[in-house]
Amino acid sequence: MSKTTKYTGTQTEKNLMAAFAGESQARNKYTYFASVAKKQGFEQIAALFLKTADNEKEHAKLWFKELEGIGDTAENLLSAAEGENYEWTDMYDGFAKTAEEEGFKELAARFRLVAAVEKHHEERYRALLHNVEMAEVFAKSEVKVWECRNCGHIVVGEKAPEICPTCNHPQSYFEIHAENY
């Protein structure tokens, strides 16, 4: 995190970052544990893992907000792109080299495969940031097929409607329709 806050350079900043990381990791672990419990027929235990995961998510959000890690959408997209860039250019590259040096060639290959996905994530976030900055999220220079994410209403045009004529949801529910089947 590169933003300067009242905690910058303090042990409290380190503690907040550790609390955020710990709560975030716990949330993920509990969702994985819930999947196992569900597969083994323990619905209540799965539900309790998920409930606790939701609690951990909120705890993490408290600490992340305290660190001023949440901005507006453009700031968040830039932050996400920068994070993904670090992951594919530095983190996973270093992990792969170390794994290879230590004889874990299959793991090194997997680190490199994930790095390629992280590169795609960066590109996607940067494209979305461009759309936000250029006011091109809900308006394009050519005709597109727009779909309401709430009710499925289809509109053909250069711009998504302000309000869905079918379900009255706002423009924010529209996306460019894509069929990938």
Residue ranges, per PLM feature:
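Non-heme di-metal
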Residues: 1-181
